[in-house]
Amino acid sequence: MAITRSVIAATALLGAAANAQVVGTPFGFGAATTGGGDVTPAAPADTAELTKWLADDEPRVILIDKEFNFLGDECTDCECCIPDSNTCGDAGQNAIEVGIGWCGDYPTTTCTYDKAGLDGLDVGPNKSIVGVGDAGVIRGKGLRIHGTENVIVQNIHITELNPQYIWGGDAISLDGADKVWIDHVKISLVGRQMFVTGYESSTLILFSCSEPPLNDYRRKRHLL
C-alpha cells in the first residue's frame, strides 16, 4: 500500500511539472518573447540551485513550485537616515544608506534590515520562470533582468523586501532588457519599487494581468 501511494504521489508530481509550462501567448510588445521555449520544465531543489539556474546562459523553464525564502542574513545596527518624508517617527519609513548619496544631509540613525532584498536575483537569457498553482513564492529577493533578453515571468508572488525601509528592494528591475513578458505576477511588501527600469533602455516589454499592492485609497481609484 505504501509503495502504491508513493507511485501515485510521484506520478502526480510529474504531471504537475508537465502541465506547468507557460500559459497563454504574449501579444503586442511581447509577441516575440519565447522564454525557455519547449525545454523540459524543472524545479530547483533550493535557493542556491534557483539562483544558479536563473543566472546561467542555458534556456530553461524554471518551475517555482514552493516558497523560496532568501531571508535570514540581517544587517544589524546598520546606517540609515531619517528623510523629511518621515513625519511619523518610529512609525514612519526611514531609508537605508545604500552608498549613492541619497541620504545627503538627512539625520542619521541605525536600523536592522535583511541584506537579501537589496540585490535582486540575476536572470539570464531564454528563461521561463513559472509558478506552479498557488505555490510559487520568492520571499526576500526580487528579479534583476539586466542586459538580457527573452524572459517570461508568470504566476509567481514576490514578497517581503524590507517593506519598512526606503531602498529596501525592488521586486522586478529591468535595465537594457529586450523581449520580456511579465504576466500574472503578484507583488507585496516591497521597500522600493514593484517594477523599475534603469538607465539603459529596455525594449519589447509586456506587463499583463499583474497585481501590485494597493491600499484602500488607491484601490478605489485605480484599475488593475
Spans of model-derived segments:
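Generic detection of short hydrophobic beta-strand segments and adjacent strand-loop junctions
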Residues: A42, F68, L121-V123
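Short, solvent-exposed loop/turn elements at domain surfaces
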Residues: T51-W53, F70-D73
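Acidic glycine-/aspartate-rich tracts in secreted/extracellular proteins
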Residues: A48, E67-F70, D134-A135
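Short N-terminal amphipathic alpha-helices
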Residues: I64, G72-E74, I96
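Short loop/turn segments at strand-loop or loop-helix junctions that form parts
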Residues: D65-E67, I156
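Right-handed parallel beta-helix
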Residues: D77-L224
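Fungal secretory targeting signals
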Residues: M1-A20
